[in-house]
Amino acid sequence: MIELGPVTAMHDHPVEELRQALDHLRLALMSAGRGPHHMTGMVWTTTAPALFDLANPTIDLAYREVFAGFRPPIEIEMAPAGGPRLSIRATVARPAPLPVGPLWRGYDLPTLMREYSPRGQVPAVAPIFEHYREEGAAFLGAHAHREVAYGAGPRERLDLLLPSGIAEPRLHVFIHGGYWQAMDKGNHAQFTRAFLEAGYAVAMLNYSLAPEKPLDGLVAEIRAALGFLWHQAPALGIARLPFDLAGHSAGGHLAAMAVATDWAALGLPPDLIGTATLLSGLYELEPLTHLPMAPLLALDRISAHWLSPVHLPRPSATRVLLAVGGLESDEFKHQTALLAEAWNVPVGRHRIVPDRNHFTIVDEFAEGPLALAALANAAP
């Protein structure tokens, strides 16, 4: 057992102060050859505990942006007067011996972890996330919208944006990523720009984040949200026509699971999802069972199989467009290729987007050739 820290940050805003301090701790973990899953405890020493309360959703999201769902027990202690407003230290376990040999497609564990770590492939990711937050807030600030509850949970919410001057528009639904453990609908509203400007209504979905719910629970929430939107369409001012659905990263997985759903068995139209764009998603989950995140998702080999879209029947009622960034890892490209093969997606609707990584491909979806392709795919 070792102790890392204390780490501090100086910023006027407590959320950004926490985010920067946690990122310093993340770098210290990396330097020590450890990861977030090795942390056994944290101590936050602060002069203002109320400012860093993880019960505050904004603080919770800032934590998750750095460490996702990995959260050891956290002790809060008062700092002496005159010290930094926040300092953080962590106790870290000795790494367990690594399994020997290949685990998936010839990859050993360290290589597999790198392949499935988009953050590790994009060193300067913090400015990208800041761009997400700022652009999302600006987009929502510039467009009338309302938050609607589709379920009882605190994150079972959606933001609904309606185009001006169009009665009962068709609906475009977007599901954000974050490895099922992080991010928020408000960080992603800007990526629906092309659809809103084309006259679609837009629903931005939030959902519970692991480990507060396992992955199958998140799939159920997305299905519930889509059913809610169909049943409430007249009251919400949207058309009862097949939806267009999009999802990025973990949201791509959740969107694919929705596409593969037997909607008729749930008392809904079989073509509830008419068209879908799946961006840099995860469609074969077996390799994730070897990674430290698996327990957070309650994912084992059995659940990974039936939660993998590649093992579900090919949807006949939905026209699917697949895209992945040209700068993404071989495994993320392979994930998209697997679904294209399993679902017999035509070559013209399976795209590798040049010069885009896992986090910037959504910019291309907001405006650019990928946006035009998604709109063409969604056209009746």
Feature-to-residue mapping (PLM):
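Short, polar/acidic, helix-capping and beta-turn segments at strand->helix junctions
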Residues: 1-101
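A fold-wide structural signal in alpha/beta-hydrolase
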Residues: 171, 196-206
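C-terminal catalytic histidine-bearing segment of alpha/beta-hydrolase fold enzymes
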Residues: 333-337, 344-380
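Primarily recognizes the serine-hydrolase "nucleophile elbow" in alpha/beta-hydrolase
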Residues: 227-291, 304
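The feature captures the conserved acid-bearing segment of alpha/beta-hydrolase catalytic domains
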Residues: 269-270, 275-289, 301-338
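Catalytic nucleophile-loop/oxyanion-hole region of alpha/beta-hydrolase
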Residues: 183-192, 203-242
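Short, surface-exposed "cap/lid" segments of acyl-processing enzymes
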Residues: 164-195
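N-terminal cap/lid segment of alpha/beta-hydrolase-fold proteins
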Residues: 111-166
